[in-house]
């Protein structure tokens, strides 16, 4: 810390496990959150690691993808992984025995939203009039397009990319456009691109960690049955 110029005073007073009780809920806080005063407060953990635990991951080899604006995919294992493109930390359960390694794709749910906001005015108007989700309408059209989007390929690096590329200057690309392609083709290719980004992370991990099946997915992406099927097809794994 001296070499990096970080004052020791900024560090926590002590290191604790995620399950350690570090305090009690005050009366004021209890009123705000609807819990009892004095409720034990645990140290907790990083957001996606706790989401992994909440998905029921307790054993080595189990893995979860948290898919919202971006992707965070992580696996529980023992020992240090061979692939150093992943980020590794103690797992929230049995932290002395188990590790959690993860990689992330920067752009996931942000891509369908970008497409909808810029190219789906008709679907948004229908949503306002009928209450039907504009994303659901886009899914219906994209489901009619064959896997592979008739040769259309999207690289989903619209906000740079994290694991395993780690390049903030990577940029999104739409390849193979022809006059045959429609809006539905582009939307499906976007969904497929995120699935392949997840597969890229998983394949980078498989060099040193034995992965189990299925892959559990949590987050907003799970609202789309089409997208979940695309993930299953691309990963070759039950979801």
What are these model-predicted stretches?
Residues 1-96, 106, 123, 129-136, ...:
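ATP-dependent carbohydrate kinase catalytic cores
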Residues 3-4, 28, 32, 114, ...:
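Generic, well-ordered alpha-helical scaffold segments in large soluble proteins
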Residues 38-39, 60, 101, 184, ...:
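Alpha-helical hydrophobic/aromatic positions enriched in membrane-embedded helices and signal peptides
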Residues 42, 59, 66-67, 95, ...:
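Short glycine/serine/threonine-biased micro-segments
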Residues 58-59, 79, 117-124, 196, ...:
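Short, well-ordered loop/turn and helix-capping segments at boundaries between secondary-structure elements
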Residues 91-102, 175-176, 235-239:
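Short beta-alpha connecting loops at secondary-structure transitions
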Residues 96-123:
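A conserved active-site cap/scaffold subdomain adjacent to cofactor or substrate pockets
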Residues 143-239:
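Activation-segment/catalytic-loop signature of the eukaryotic protein kinase fold
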């Amino acid at each position: 810390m001296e070499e990096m110029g970080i004052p020791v005073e900024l560090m926590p007073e002590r290191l604790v496990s995620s399950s350690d009780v570090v305090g009690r809920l005050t009366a004021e806080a209890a009123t705000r959150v609807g819990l009892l005063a004095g409720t034990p407060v645990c140290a907790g953990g990083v957001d996606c690691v706790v989401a992994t635990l909440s998905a029921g991951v307790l054993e080595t080899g189990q893995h979860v993808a948290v898919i919202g604006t971006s992707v965070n995919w992580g696996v529980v294992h023992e020992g240090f992984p061979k692939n150093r493109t992943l980020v590794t930390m103690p797992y929230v359960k049995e932290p002395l025995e188990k590790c959690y390694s993860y990689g992330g794709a920067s752009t996931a749910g942000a891509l369908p939203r970008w497409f909808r906001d810029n190219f789906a005015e008709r679907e948004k108007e229908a949503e306002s009039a009928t209450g039907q989700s504009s994303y659901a309408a886009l899914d219906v059209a994209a489901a009619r397009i064959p896997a592979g989007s008739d040769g259309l390929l999207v690289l989903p690096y619209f906000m740079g990319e994290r694991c395993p590329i780690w390049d903030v200057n990577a940029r999104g690309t739409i390849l193979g456009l022809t006059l045959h392609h429609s809006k539905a083709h582009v939307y499906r290719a976007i969904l497929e691109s995120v699935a392949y980004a997840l597969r890229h992370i998983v394949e980078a991990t498989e060099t040193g960690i034995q992965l189990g099946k299925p892959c559990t997915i949590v987050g907003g992406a799970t609202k789309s049955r089409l997208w979940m099927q695309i993930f299953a097809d691309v990963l070759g794994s039950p979801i």
